[in-house]
């Protein structure tokens, strides 16, 4: 694994935002057997979870995940976990937040961006189960668009069109670039996105809109695409204009507590990487510290960008008395 992306072990104290808690007595883990090309099945995740006293629910094809999570919470579960992609994680996380239950992320998807930003070792699928038995708890924000929770981001415009393509799962970057090339050709029709920011300013001619649950770091090559924190209480917003349509800088970023967008029709979107149509107006909000998250005490680390921004450790002088 790239050492630059490996989360370090950090002390559990007030500065880390983590606190030790008693392990849940009736935890339930939902497992999507198809996520990550069958990653959970190959690791024998369900069997190993049950050995730890965790109720493992392997989801059937087309099973209603939200209903299953709500049923578990209403039935007495005192912690909910999800092994799957980030879209599935968001669905169970929203239920956990609604019932004030702790949530466990098990990185069984393809990219596992949420796990990376939590400071987990996103390649340690089995080790993530330790969160249920020897975990530490922290509170993070949860974002919503039109009442639907997301843990990472909502992408509109070029990216929103790209995630709808069948090739996206296997070749994300190439598919986005191909979509961008098609959309940017002269005469191509872009989604008519109209954004009003938190100061009342209007934005038109948008090629890409990215609204994230906390802002992304954009200044560090190795850490780019990760978030330094998940508890700032702010949405991150990134806009890219259609080239040649405006005289200002084509890219803009800022943070806000809420955001509203309108469009003439339903908008193609990628919500935590899952394709869907969102009805206008699109209303984004953030719920500060709404989600309790349990993380294995073996690696309650920081995201790559958080490590880049953290001050160097203070080392005692050799000459100190």
What are these regions (language model features)?
Residues 30, 39, 43, 48, ...:
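Catalytic core of DAGKc-family lipid kinases
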Residues 82-86:
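N-terminal glycine-rich "phosphate-gripper" loop used for MgATP/nucleotide binding
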Residues 2-17, 198, 229-232, 239-321:
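ATP/nucleoside-binding phosphotransfer catalytic cores, i.e., glycine-rich phosphate-binding loops
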Residues 1-80, 90, 300-302, 308-321:
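ATP/NTP phosphate-donor binding region
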Residues 201, 206-247:
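Internal helical hairpin/lid segments
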Residues 37-40, 218-219, 293:
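Short N-terminal binding/cap micro-motifs at the start of the first secondary-structure element
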Residues 88, 209, 273:
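Conserved Motif II region of HX4D acyltransferases
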């Amino acid at each position: 694994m790239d050492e630059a992306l490996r989360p370090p072990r950090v002390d559990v104290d007030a500065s880390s935002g983590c606190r030790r808690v008693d392990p849940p007595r009736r935890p339930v883990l939902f497992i999507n057997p198809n996520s990550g090309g069958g990653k959970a099945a190959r690791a024998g995740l369900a069997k190993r979870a049950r050995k730890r006293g965790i109720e493992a629910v392997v989801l059937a094809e087309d099973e209603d995940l939200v209903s299953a999570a709500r049923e578990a919470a209403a039935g007495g579960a005192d912690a909910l976990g999800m092994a799957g992609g980030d879209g599935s994680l968001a669905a169970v996380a929203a239920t956990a937040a609604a019932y004030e239950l702790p949530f466990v992320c098990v990185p069984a998807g393809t990219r596992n961006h949420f796990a990376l930003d939590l400071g987990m070792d996103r390649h340690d699928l089995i080790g993530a189960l330790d969160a249920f038995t020897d975990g530490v708890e922290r509170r993070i924000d949860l974002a919503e668009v039109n009442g639907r929770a997301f843990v990472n981001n909502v992408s509109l415009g070029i990216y929103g069109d790209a995630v709808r393509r069948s090739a996206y799962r296997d070749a994300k970057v190439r598919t986005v670039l191909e979509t961008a090339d098609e959309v940017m050709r002269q005469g191509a029709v872009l989604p008519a996105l109209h954004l009003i920011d938190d100061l009342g300013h209007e934005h038109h001619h948008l090629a890409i809109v990215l609204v994230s649950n906390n802002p992304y770091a954009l200044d560090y090559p190795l850490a780019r695409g990760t978030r330094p924190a998940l508890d700032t209480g702010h949405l991150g917003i990134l806009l890219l204009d259609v080239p040649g349509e405006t005289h200002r800088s084509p890219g803009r970023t800022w943070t806000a507590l809420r955001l509203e967008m309108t469009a003439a029709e339903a908008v193609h979107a990628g919500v935590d990487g899952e394709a869907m149509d969102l009805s206008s107006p699109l209303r984004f909000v953030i719920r500060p510290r709404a989600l309790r998250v349990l993380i294995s005490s073996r690696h309650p680390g920081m995201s790559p960008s958080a490590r880049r921004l953290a001050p160097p450790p203070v080392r005692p002088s050799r000459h100190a008395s």
